[in-house]
C-alpha cells in the first residue's frame, strides 16, 4: 500500500481550437464558486453573449501560447508531478485538473484509492485560498467519496516565501528596476466582503516575501491584482492601471512577479508578457520584465514533497494522541 499525492491545478482546453475553448469556458464560467450570480440570470448572459464573443478571442490567445507539449499550464504541472515522483519514489504521485476534461479530480482519486493508496494527500496548486479556486477543487474532492488529507493553502510557509524571494532577487539583479510588483489574480470584492480570506492571504504573502528579499529595496515593492473579468468591482489596484500610472510618474523600468500562479498560463504569458507589456510601453514605459512562475522548478518541488511528508507525519502523530 503506497501513500498517495494528488496535485491539482486549474485546467486548460484540450486544444486551442475555438470549439474546445468554448467548452472549457462554459464549464469554468458555469461554476457557481466562480460566478455567484443565480444561474437563471447568468446562463443566458453566458451562452448568449460571453461564449460567442470570448471563445474565439481566447482561442487566439491560446494559439499564441500553445506548445508542442500542449497547454503550458498542463505541461508545467506534468513537470511538477514528474519531479515529485523522483523525490517521493515510494508514493503514487498523480495530477488532476479542475476543468477541461483531462485529468478529472474524482476519477483520478477513485483510481488511486482502487490501487490501495492510503493516505492520499491533496494539494491544490494555489498558495492562497479562495472560493473561486481552492473551494471548488475541495468540493470535487469531497464529492469523490475518497478519504483524503488536504493541504488547502501554503502561502504562509517560510520555505515557499524564500523561494519566491530568491526568484525575484535573481530577476531584479539582471536589470535596473524602479518598481517591483507582486501581482495576484484578482477576485470580486463581494467575495471578500462575504468572508473570503484571499486578500488577507495575498497581503501576508507579500509581507513575507519582502522580509526575505536580499537585493530588492523594500521601498520598491508593491502589490496589485490582475485578470479582472466582468463589470463588478474586483480587488484593487488593478495591475494594468498601475502600470500606466507608473509610466506617467517616470517609473519606466518595472519587474512583475505573480505569486498566485505557480505555472505559466494565459495570465502570465499573454496578459502580462504581451498585453500589459504593450500597455506599459505605449504609456511611456521602457523596460518591462516578468519573473517566471515556479514551473516545476527544483526548489518548489522540494518544498511540495516536504509539505506532503510533513502533513502525513502530523496526521500520524495526531492519530496517536
UniProtKB/Swiss-Prot annotation:
Pfam families reported in the protein's UniProt record: Ferrochelatase
One cellular-component annotation, GO: cytoplasm
Molecular function terms from GO: ferrochelatase activity; metal ion binding
UniProt enzyme class: lyase
Sorted UniProt keywords: Cytoplasm, Heme biosynthesis, Iron, Lyase, Metal-binding, Porphyrin biosynthesis
Binding site for Fe(2+): 185, 267
Catalysed reaction equations from the record: Fe-coproporphyrin III + 2 H(+) = coproporphyrin III + Fe(2+)
Keyword Lyase: yes
Family the UniProt entry places it in: Belongs to the ferrochelatase family.
PANTHER family: FERROCHELATASE, FERROCHELATASE, MITOCHONDRIAL
Function: Involved in coproporphyrin-dependent heme b biosynthesis. Catalyzes the insertion of ferrous iron into coproporphyrin III to form Fe-coproporphyrin III.
Protein name: Coproporphyrin III ferrochelatase
Amino acid at each position: 500500500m503506497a501513500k498517495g499525492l494528488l496535485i491539482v491545478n486549474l485546467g486548460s482546453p484540450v486544444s486551442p481550437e475555438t470549439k474546445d475553448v468554448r467548452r472549457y469556458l462554459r464549464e469554468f464560467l458555469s461554476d457557481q464558486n466562480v460566478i455567484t450570480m443565480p444561474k437563471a440570470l447568468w446562463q443566458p448572459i453566458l451562452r448568449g453573449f460571453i461564449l460567442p464573443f470570448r471563445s474565439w478571442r481566447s482561442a487566439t490567445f491560446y494559439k499564441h501560447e500553445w506548445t508542442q507539449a500542449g497547454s503550458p499550464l498542463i505541461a508545467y504541472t506534468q513537470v511538477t508531478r514528474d519531479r515529485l515522483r523522483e523525490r517521493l519514489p515510494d508514493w503514487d504521485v498523480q495530477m488532476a485538473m479542475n476543468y477541461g476534461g483531462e485529468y478529472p479530480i474524482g476519477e483520478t482519486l477513485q483510481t488511486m484509492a482502487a490501487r490501495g493508496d492510503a493516505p492520499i494527500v491533496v494539494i491544490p496548486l494555489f498558495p492562497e485560498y479562495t472560493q473561486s479556486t481552492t473551494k471548488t477543487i475541495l468540493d470535487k474532492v469531497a464529492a469523490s467519496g475518497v478519504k483524503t488529507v488536504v493541504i488547502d493553502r501554503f502561502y504562509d510557509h517560510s520555505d515557499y516565501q524564500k523561494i519566491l524571494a530568491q526568484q525575484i532577487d535573481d530577476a531584479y539583479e539582471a536589470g535596473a528596476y524602479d518598481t517591483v510588483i507582486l501581482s495576484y489574480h484578482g477576485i470580486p470584492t463581494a467575495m471578500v466582503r462575504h468572508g473570503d480570506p484571499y486578500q488577507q492571504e495575498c497581503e501576508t504573502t507579500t509581507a513575507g516575501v519582502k522580509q526575505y528579499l536580499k537585493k530588492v529595496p523594500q521601498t520598491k515593492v508593491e502589490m496589485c491584482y490582475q485578470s479582472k473579468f466582468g463589470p463588478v468591482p474586483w480587488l484593487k489596484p488593478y495591475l494594468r492601471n498601475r502600470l500606466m500610472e507608473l509610466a506617467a510618474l517616470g517609473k519606466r523600468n518595472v519587474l512583475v512577479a505573480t505569486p498566485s500562479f505557480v505555472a505559466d498560463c494565459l495570465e502570465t504569458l499573454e496578459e502580462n508578457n504581451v498585453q500589459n507589456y504593450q500597455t506599459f510601453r505605449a504609456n511611456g514605459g521602457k523596460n518591462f520584465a516578468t519573473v517566471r512562475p515556479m514551473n516545476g522548478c527544483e526548489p518548489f518541488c522540494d518544498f511540495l514533497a516536504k509539505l506532503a511528508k510533513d502533513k502525513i507525519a502530523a496526521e500520524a502523530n495526531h492519530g496517536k494522541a
